[in-house]
Protein backbone atom coordinates (compact mmCIF):
# COMPACT_ATOMS: atom_id res chain seq x y z
CA UNK A 1 0.00 0.00 0.00
CA UNK A 2 1.26 3.45 -0.91
CA UNK A 3 0.51 6.39 1.36
CA UNK A 4 0.55 9.98 0.13
CA UNK A 5 0.12 13.05 2.30
CA UNK A 6 -0.57 16.37 0.58
CA UNK A 7 0.77 18.89 3.07
CA UNK A 8 -0.16 22.00 1.11
CA UNK A 9 -3.77 22.40 2.26
CA UNK A 10 -3.10 22.79 5.97
CA UNK A 11 -1.49 26.17 6.45
CA UNK A 12 -1.34 26.90 2.72
CA UNK A 13 -2.64 30.44 3.20
CA UNK A 14 -0.14 31.01 6.00
CA UNK A 15 2.63 29.86 3.66
CA UNK A 16 1.48 32.29 0.99
CA UNK A 17 1.37 35.16 3.45
CA UNK A 18 4.78 34.25 4.83
CA UNK A 19 6.25 34.47 1.35
CA UNK A 20 4.95 37.99 0.96
CA UNK A 21 7.31 39.13 3.72
CA UNK A 22 10.98 39.79 2.92
CA UNK A 23 12.99 36.61 3.20
CA UNK A 24 15.24 36.49 6.26
CA UNK A 25 18.69 34.98 5.67
CA UNK A 26 19.12 31.47 7.02
CA UNK A 27 21.95 30.50 9.34
CA UNK A 28 21.78 26.95 8.01
CA UNK A 29 24.70 26.31 5.66
CA UNK A 30 27.11 28.88 7.10
CA UNK A 31 30.49 27.80 8.42
CA UNK A 32 31.29 28.60 12.06
CA UNK A 33 33.38 31.57 10.95
CA UNK A 34 30.55 32.82 8.71
CA UNK A 35 28.07 32.38 11.57
CA UNK A 36 30.19 34.60 13.79
CA UNK A 37 30.59 37.19 11.05
CA UNK A 38 26.82 37.27 10.41
CA UNK A 39 26.07 37.78 14.09
CA UNK A 40 28.56 40.64 14.40
CA UNK A 41 27.45 42.26 11.13
CA UNK A 42 23.83 42.26 12.32
CA UNK A 43 24.88 44.17 15.44
CA UNK A 44 23.30 41.71 17.88
CA UNK A 45 26.53 40.09 19.14
CA UNK A 46 29.81 41.85 20.03
CA UNK A 47 32.88 40.54 18.25
CA UNK A 48 34.35 39.11 21.46
CA UNK A 49 31.34 36.78 21.80
CA UNK A 50 31.08 35.77 18.15
CA UNK A 51 32.97 32.49 18.36
CA UNK A 52 31.11 31.32 21.47
CA UNK A 53 27.69 32.26 20.09
CA UNK A 54 28.46 30.61 16.76
CA UNK A 55 29.33 27.38 18.57
CA UNK A 56 26.08 27.56 20.55
CA UNK A 57 24.05 27.97 17.38
CA UNK A 58 25.98 25.19 15.63
CA UNK A 59 25.12 22.78 18.45
CA UNK A 60 21.42 23.69 18.43
CA UNK A 61 21.11 23.48 14.63
CA UNK A 62 23.11 20.35 13.92
CA UNK A 63 23.23 18.29 17.14
CA UNK A 64 19.81 19.06 18.62
CA UNK A 65 18.07 19.74 15.32
CA UNK A 66 16.23 22.83 16.55
CA UNK A 67 14.38 24.73 13.82
CA UNK A 68 13.20 27.69 15.92
CA UNK A 69 15.32 30.08 17.99
CA UNK A 70 12.74 29.80 20.79
CA UNK A 71 13.98 26.28 21.50
CA UNK A 72 17.59 27.36 22.15
CA UNK A 73 17.26 27.41 25.93
CA UNK A 74 20.83 28.33 26.92
CA UNK A 75 20.58 31.58 24.95
CA UNK A 76 18.93 34.56 26.64
CA UNK A 77 15.35 35.39 25.71
CA UNK A 78 16.35 38.84 24.45
CA UNK A 79 19.08 37.45 22.20
CA UNK A 80 16.72 34.78 20.87
CA UNK A 81 14.27 37.53 19.95
CA UNK A 82 17.01 39.44 18.12
CA UNK A 83 18.12 36.30 16.30
CA UNK A 84 14.55 35.66 15.20
CA UNK A 85 14.24 39.26 14.01
CA UNK A 86 17.28 39.01 11.75
CA UNK A 87 17.64 35.34 10.78
CA UNK A 88 15.87 32.01 10.37
CA UNK A 89 16.71 28.36 10.97
CA UNK A 90 13.34 27.13 9.71
CA UNK A 91 12.82 24.08 7.52
CA UNK A 92 11.53 24.26 3.94
CA UNK A 93 7.90 23.75 3.07
CA UNK A 94 6.98 20.08 2.61
CA UNK A 95 4.47 19.95 -0.23
CA UNK A 96 3.96 16.21 -0.13
CA UNK A 97 5.23 13.10 1.63
CA UNK A 98 4.76 9.72 -0.01
CA UNK A 99 5.43 6.39 1.67
CA UNK A 100 6.00 3.32 -0.46
CA UNK A 101 4.79 -0.15 0.40
CA UNK A 102 8.45 -1.08 1.03
CA UNK A 103 8.98 1.78 3.53
CA UNK A 104 10.76 4.12 1.12
CA UNK A 105 9.76 7.75 1.66
CA UNK A 106 9.77 10.58 -0.85
CA UNK A 107 9.39 14.23 0.06
CA UNK A 108 8.54 17.05 -2.31
CA UNK A 109 10.13 20.23 -0.93
CA UNK A 110 9.38 23.78 -2.02
CA UNK A 111 12.02 26.53 -1.86
CA UNK A 112 11.90 30.28 -2.64
CA UNK A 113 12.54 31.43 -6.25
CA UNK A 114 15.99 32.96 -5.65
CA UNK A 115 16.20 34.10 -9.24
CA UNK A 116 14.08 31.33 -10.76
CA UNK A 117 10.97 33.50 -11.21
CA UNK A 118 8.73 31.33 -9.06
CA UNK A 119 9.06 28.88 -6.15
CA UNK A 120 10.97 25.73 -7.02
CA UNK A 121 10.45 22.14 -5.97
CA UNK A 122 12.79 19.18 -5.56
CA UNK A 123 12.48 15.60 -4.41
CA UNK A 124 14.40 13.76 -1.70
CA UNK A 125 14.18 10.03 -1.01
CA UNK A 126 14.78 7.98 2.14
CA UNK A 127 15.56 4.27 1.74
CA UNK A 128 15.48 2.14 4.92
CA UNK A 129 17.48 -1.08 4.91
CA UNK A 130 18.66 -3.63 7.44
CA UNK A 131 21.29 -1.85 9.52
CA UNK A 132 21.24 1.48 7.72
CA UNK A 133 19.05 4.25 6.34
CA UNK A 134 20.13 6.07 3.20
CA UNK A 135 19.01 9.55 2.17
CA UNK A 136 19.21 10.40 -1.54
CA UNK A 137 19.78 14.16 -1.79
CA UNK A 138 19.27 16.52 -4.74
CA UNK A 139 21.79 19.21 -5.72
CA UNK A 140 19.93 21.06 -8.49
CA UNK A 141 16.38 21.86 -9.53
CA UNK A 142 16.24 19.89 -12.76
CA UNK A 143 19.33 18.85 -14.69
CA UNK A 144 21.32 19.80 -17.80
CA UNK A 145 22.66 16.35 -18.63
CA UNK A 146 19.64 14.86 -20.47
CA UNK A 147 20.67 11.25 -19.86
CA UNK A 148 18.23 9.41 -22.08
CA UNK A 149 17.15 6.80 -19.51
CA UNK A 150 16.68 9.22 -16.59
CA UNK A 151 13.40 10.94 -15.70
CA UNK A 152 15.16 13.92 -14.09
CA UNK A 153 16.89 14.53 -17.41
CA UNK A 154 13.53 15.44 -18.96
CA UNK A 155 13.25 18.43 -16.62
CA UNK A 156 15.27 21.47 -17.67
CA UNK A 157 17.66 22.98 -15.16
CA UNK A 158 15.98 25.78 -13.21
CA UNK A 159 18.77 26.65 -10.79
CA UNK A 160 21.37 25.26 -8.41
CA UNK A 161 20.41 24.54 -4.84
CA UNK A 162 22.16 26.54 -2.13
CA UNK A 163 24.17 24.97 0.67
CA UNK A 164 21.26 25.70 2.99
CA UNK A 165 18.81 23.91 0.68
CA UNK A 166 21.05 20.85 0.35
CA UNK A 167 21.43 20.58 4.13
CA UNK A 168 17.72 21.29 4.65
CA UNK A 169 16.90 17.99 2.95
CA UNK A 170 18.98 16.12 5.52
CA UNK A 171 17.70 18.11 8.49
CA UNK A 172 14.05 17.77 7.49
CA UNK A 173 14.37 14.05 6.84
CA UNK A 174 15.84 13.60 10.31
CA UNK A 175 12.96 15.66 11.71
CA UNK A 176 10.36 13.50 10.00
CA UNK A 177 12.04 10.26 11.08
CA UNK A 178 12.66 11.25 14.70
CA UNK A 179 16.43 11.11 14.21
CA UNK A 180 17.36 13.98 16.53
CA UNK A 181 17.66 13.65 20.34
CA UNK A 182 14.37 13.46 22.24
CA UNK A 183 12.36 12.93 19.05
CA UNK A 184 9.92 10.09 18.44
CA UNK A 185 9.95 7.90 15.35
CA UNK A 186 6.58 8.02 13.53
CA UNK A 187 4.29 5.08 14.23
CA UNK A 188 4.76 2.33 11.68
CA UNK A 189 7.86 3.87 10.10
CA UNK A 190 10.33 1.39 8.65
CA UNK A 191 13.76 2.44 9.95
CA UNK A 192 16.95 0.66 11.08
CA UNK A 193 16.40 -1.17 14.37
CA UNK A 194 19.46 0.41 15.97
CA UNK A 195 21.57 3.53 15.56
CA UNK A 196 20.77 6.45 13.32
CA UNK A 197 17.72 6.52 11.11
CA UNK A 198 19.77 8.42 8.51
CA UNK A 199 23.19 6.77 8.59
CA UNK A 200 24.22 7.31 4.97
CA UNK A 201 23.70 10.04 2.40
CA UNK A 202 24.15 9.82 -1.34
CA UNK A 203 24.31 12.79 -3.70
CA UNK A 204 22.30 10.89 -6.29
CA UNK A 205 19.07 12.88 -6.41
CA UNK A 206 18.12 15.51 -8.95
CA UNK A 207 20.97 17.27 -10.72
CA UNK A 208 24.71 16.87 -11.28
CA UNK A 209 26.51 17.61 -7.98
CA UNK A 210 29.78 18.59 -9.65
CA UNK A 211 28.01 21.33 -11.60
CA UNK A 212 27.20 22.85 -8.21
CA UNK A 213 30.56 22.07 -6.66
CA UNK A 214 31.01 24.84 -4.10
CA UNK A 215 27.55 24.52 -2.53
CA UNK A 216 27.79 20.72 -2.46
CA UNK A 217 31.29 20.83 -0.99
CA UNK A 218 30.24 23.17 1.79
CA UNK A 219 27.12 21.13 2.59
CA UNK A 220 29.01 17.84 2.78
CA UNK A 221 31.77 19.31 4.96
CA UNK A 222 29.10 20.57 7.38
CA UNK A 223 27.30 17.20 7.27
CA UNK A 224 30.53 15.40 8.15
CA UNK A 225 31.66 17.83 10.86
CA UNK A 226 32.38 15.83 14.01
CA UNK A 227 30.83 18.45 16.30
CA UNK A 228 27.54 18.58 14.44
CA UNK A 229 25.74 16.17 12.14
CA UNK A 230 28.85 13.99 12.33
CA UNK A 231 28.29 11.69 9.36
CA UNK A 232 31.34 9.63 8.46
CA UNK A 233 32.81 10.53 5.07
CA UNK A 234 32.83 6.80 4.34
CA UNK A 235 29.04 6.95 4.60
CA UNK A 236 28.73 9.86 2.16
CA UNK A 237 28.79 9.10 -1.56
CA UNK A 238 28.85 11.68 -4.32
CA UNK A 239 27.67 10.44 -7.71
CA UNK A 240 28.71 12.14 -10.94
CA UNK A 241 27.95 11.47 -14.58
CA UNK A 242 31.55 12.34 -15.34
CA UNK A 243 32.46 16.00 -14.82
CA UNK A 244 36.12 15.13 -15.15
CA UNK A 245 37.75 18.43 -14.03
CA UNK A 246 36.00 18.29 -10.65
CA UNK A 247 36.61 14.62 -9.81
CA UNK A 248 40.10 15.11 -8.34
CA UNK A 249 38.85 18.14 -6.39
CA UNK A 250 36.08 16.00 -4.92
CA UNK A 251 38.59 13.63 -3.39
CA UNK A 252 41.09 16.33 -2.42
CA UNK A 253 38.70 18.93 -0.97
CA UNK A 254 35.70 16.89 0.23
CA UNK A 255 37.14 13.40 0.74
CA UNK A 256 33.91 11.43 0.35
CA UNK A 257 33.23 8.21 -1.51
CA UNK A 258 32.87 8.52 -5.29
CA UNK A 259 30.32 6.93 -7.60
CA UNK A 260 30.35 7.17 -11.39
CA UNK A 261 27.19 6.89 -13.50
CA UNK A 262 28.85 4.77 -16.17
CA UNK A 263 26.14 2.72 -17.97
CA UNK A 264 28.20 1.93 -21.08
CA UNK A 265 31.65 0.61 -21.94
CA UNK A 266 32.26 2.38 -25.26
CA UNK A 267 31.99 6.00 -26.32
CA UNK A 268 29.43 5.46 -29.07
CA UNK A 269 26.83 4.04 -26.69
CA UNK A 270 27.72 6.30 -23.78
CA UNK A 271 27.35 9.35 -26.04
CA UNK A 272 23.70 8.31 -26.47
CA UNK A 273 22.96 7.32 -22.88
CA UNK A 274 25.04 9.94 -21.04
CA UNK A 275 25.64 12.87 -23.42
CA UNK A 276 28.26 14.51 -21.19
CA UNK A 277 30.50 11.74 -22.56
CA UNK A 278 30.85 13.81 -25.75
CA UNK A 279 32.68 16.43 -23.67
CA UNK A 280 34.53 14.08 -21.33
CA UNK A 281 34.95 10.71 -23.09
CA UNK A 282 35.64 7.43 -21.32
CA UNK A 283 39.42 7.66 -21.65
CA UNK A 284 39.46 10.94 -19.69
CA UNK A 285 36.86 9.74 -17.18
CA UNK A 286 38.67 6.50 -16.37
CA UNK A 287 42.00 8.35 -16.06
CA UNK A 288 40.39 10.72 -13.54
CA UNK A 289 39.08 7.73 -11.58
CA UNK A 290 42.53 6.13 -11.43
CA UNK A 291 43.89 9.40 -10.01
CA UNK A 292 41.16 9.81 -7.37
CA UNK A 293 42.81 10.78 -4.03
CA UNK A 294 42.78 7.97 -1.46
CA UNK A 295 41.70 5.31 -3.95
CA UNK A 296 42.32 1.87 -2.42
CA UNK A 297 40.57 -1.42 -1.69
CA UNK A 298 39.21 0.26 1.44
CA UNK A 299 38.01 3.26 -0.57
CA UNK A 300 36.71 1.84 -3.80
CA UNK A 301 34.89 3.73 -6.51
CA UNK A 302 31.35 2.59 -7.19
CA UNK A 303 30.40 2.35 -10.85
CA UNK A 304 26.66 2.55 -11.49
CA UNK A 305 25.39 0.54 -14.44
CA UNK A 306 21.70 0.62 -15.39
CA UNK A 307 20.51 -2.58 -17.06
CA UNK A 308 18.70 -1.74 -20.30
CA UNK A 309 17.18 -4.57 -22.31
CA UNK A 310 19.06 -5.25 -25.57
CA UNK A 311 21.06 -2.05 -25.13
CA UNK A 312 23.96 -2.69 -22.72
CA UNK A 313 23.20 -6.03 -21.07
CA UNK A 314 25.08 -8.64 -23.13
CA UNK A 315 28.00 -10.74 -21.92
CA UNK A 316 30.13 -8.82 -24.43
CA UNK A 317 29.17 -5.66 -22.55
CA UNK A 318 30.21 -7.35 -19.30
CA UNK A 319 33.57 -8.26 -20.82
CA UNK A 320 34.02 -4.67 -21.97
CA UNK A 321 33.25 -3.44 -18.46
CA UNK A 322 35.92 -5.65 -16.90
CA UNK A 323 38.48 -4.52 -19.47
CA UNK A 324 37.61 -0.85 -18.97
CA UNK A 325 37.95 -0.94 -15.18
CA UNK A 326 40.98 -3.21 -14.97
CA UNK A 327 43.20 -2.23 -12.05
CA UNK A 328 40.73 0.19 -10.43
CA UNK A 329 39.56 -0.76 -6.91
CA UNK A 330 35.88 -0.80 -7.71
CA UNK A 331 32.41 -2.04 -6.94
CA UNK A 332 29.90 -2.30 -9.78
CA UNK A 333 26.28 -1.62 -8.90
CA UNK A 334 23.87 -3.16 -11.38
CA UNK A 335 20.62 -1.19 -11.43
CA UNK A 336 17.49 -2.74 -12.92
CA UNK A 337 16.00 0.02 -15.05
CA UNK A 338 13.13 1.77 -13.30
CA UNK A 339 10.40 2.71 -15.78
CA UNK A 340 8.82 6.15 -15.90
CA UNK A 341 6.05 7.68 -18.04
CA UNK A 342 7.17 8.23 -21.63
CA UNK A 343 10.40 6.23 -21.58
CA UNK A 344 11.41 4.10 -24.57
CA UNK A 345 13.62 1.76 -22.54
CA UNK A 346 12.82 -1.54 -20.87
CA UNK A 347 14.48 -3.28 -17.96
CA UNK A 348 16.66 -6.27 -18.77
CA UNK A 349 15.20 -9.67 -17.96
CA UNK A 350 16.11 -10.86 -14.48
CA UNK A 351 17.92 -13.91 -15.86
CA UNK A 352 20.02 -11.63 -18.07
CA UNK A 353 20.89 -9.39 -15.11
CA UNK A 354 21.94 -12.39 -13.01
CA UNK A 355 24.16 -13.77 -15.78
CA UNK A 356 25.75 -10.33 -16.19
CA UNK A 357 26.35 -10.11 -12.44
CA UNK A 358 27.82 -13.61 -12.29
CA UNK A 359 30.32 -12.73 -15.00
CA UNK A 360 31.38 -9.58 -13.17
CA UNK A 361 31.66 -11.42 -9.85
CA UNK A 362 33.72 -14.22 -11.38
CA UNK A 363 36.11 -11.57 -12.70
CA UNK A 364 36.76 -10.47 -9.11
CA UNK A 365 34.49 -7.46 -8.72
CA UNK A 366 31.71 -7.09 -6.18
CA UNK A 367 28.61 -6.69 -8.31
CA UNK A 368 25.44 -6.37 -6.25
CA UNK A 369 22.11 -6.04 -8.03
CA UNK A 370 20.35 -3.06 -6.54
CA UNK A 371 16.91 -3.97 -5.27
CA UNK A 372 14.39 -1.56 -6.79
CA UNK A 373 12.92 0.58 -4.01
CA UNK A 374 9.99 2.98 -4.06
CA UNK A 375 8.94 2.25 -7.63
CA UNK A 376 5.27 2.67 -6.72
CA UNK A 377 5.89 6.31 -5.76
CA UNK A 378 8.42 7.05 -8.55
CA UNK A 379 11.19 7.27 -5.96
CA UNK A 380 13.56 4.72 -7.48
CA UNK A 381 16.84 5.46 -9.23
CA UNK A 382 16.29 7.60 -12.34
CA UNK A 383 12.64 8.34 -11.55
CA UNK A 384 12.92 11.65 -9.70
CA UNK A 385 11.36 14.75 -11.19
CA UNK A 386 9.92 17.69 -9.28
CA UNK A 387 6.28 18.27 -9.96
CA UNK A 388 5.72 22.03 -9.84
CA UNK A 389 3.39 21.63 -12.79
CA UNK A 390 0.95 19.81 -10.51
CA UNK A 391 0.17 23.02 -8.63
CA UNK A 392 -3.28 24.26 -9.60
CA UNK A 393 -2.76 27.20 -11.94
CA UNK A 394 -4.75 29.61 -9.78
CA UNK A 395 -2.68 28.68 -6.70
CA UNK A 396 0.59 28.97 -8.58
CA UNK A 397 -0.26 32.39 -9.98
CA UNK A 398 -1.38 33.61 -6.56
CA UNK A 399 1.83 32.34 -5.01
CA UNK A 400 3.98 33.97 -7.68
CA UNK A 401 2.12 37.28 -7.36
CA UNK A 402 2.64 37.38 -3.60
CA UNK A 403 6.31 36.44 -3.94
CA UNK A 404 6.94 39.22 -6.46
CA UNK A 405 4.89 41.76 -4.51
CA UNK A 406 6.78 40.91 -1.34
CA UNK A 407 10.40 40.84 -2.39
CA UNK A 408 10.80 40.19 -6.07
CA UNK A 409 12.44 37.18 -7.62
CA UNK A 410 15.75 37.24 -5.79
From Swiss-Prot:
Family (UniProt): Belongs to the radical SAM superfamily. RlmN family.
Disulfide-bond pairs as recorded: 136-381
NCBIfam families given in the database record: rRNA_mod_RlmN (TIGR00048)
Cofactor(s) the record lists: [4Fe-4S] cluster
GO annotation, cellular component aspect: cytoplasm
Encoding gene (name): rlmN
Alphabetical UniProt keywords: 4Fe-4S, Cytoplasm, Disulfide bond, Iron, Iron-sulfur, Metal-binding, Methyltransferase, rRNA processing, S-adenosyl-L-methionine, Transferase, tRNA processing
Natural source organism: Mesorhizobium japonicum (strain LMG 29417 / CECT 9101 / MAFF 303099) (Mesorhizobium loti (strain MAFF 303099))
Source taxonomy: Bacteria, Pseudomonadati, Pseudomonadota, Alphaproteobacteria, Hyphomicrobiales
Span of domain Radical SAM core: 129-378
Annotated EC: 2.1.1.192
Binding-site list for S-adenosyl-L-methionine: 207-208, 239, 261-263, 338
Alphabetized PROSITE patterns for the sequence: RADICAL_SAM (PS51918)
Function: Specifically methylates position 2 of adenine 2503 in 23S rRNA and position 2 of adenine 37 in tRNAs. m2A2503 modification seems to play a crucial role in the proofreading step occurring at the peptidyl transferase center and thus would serve to optimize ribosomal fidelity.
Reaction it catalyzes: adenosine(2503) in 23S rRNA + 2 reduced [2Fe-2S]-[ferredoxin] + 2 S-adenosyl-L-methionine = 2-methyladenosine(2503) in 23S rRNA + 5'-deoxyadenosine + L-methionine + 2 oxidized [2Fe-2S]-[ferredoxin] + S-adenosyl-L-homocysteine; adenosine(37) in tRNA + 2 reduced [2Fe-2S]-[ferredoxin] + 2 S-adenosyl-L-methionine = 2-methyladenosine(37) in tRNA + 5'-deoxyadenosine + L-methionine + 2 oxidized [2Fe-2S]-[ferredoxin] + S-adenosyl-L-homocysteine
UniProt record, GO biological process: rRNA base methylation; tRNA methylation
Parts of the chain that traverse the membrane: none
GO molecular function, one term: metal ion binding
Protein origin, superkingdom: Bacteria
Location in the cell: Cytoplasm
Any further remark recorded for this protein: Reaction proceeds by a ping-pong mechanism involving intermediate methylation of a conserved cysteine residue.
Active site positions, chain numbering: 123 (proton acceptor), 381 (s-methylcysteine intermediate)
Annotated positions binding [4Fe-4S] cluster: 143, 147, 150
Class of the enzyme per the UniProt entry, highest EC level: transferase
Major localization class: cytoplasm
UniProt name for this protein: Dual-specificity RNA methyltransferase RlmN
Cofactor: binding details: Binds 1 [4Fe-4S] cluster. The cluster is coordinated with 3 cysteines and an exchangeable S-adenosyl-L-methionine.
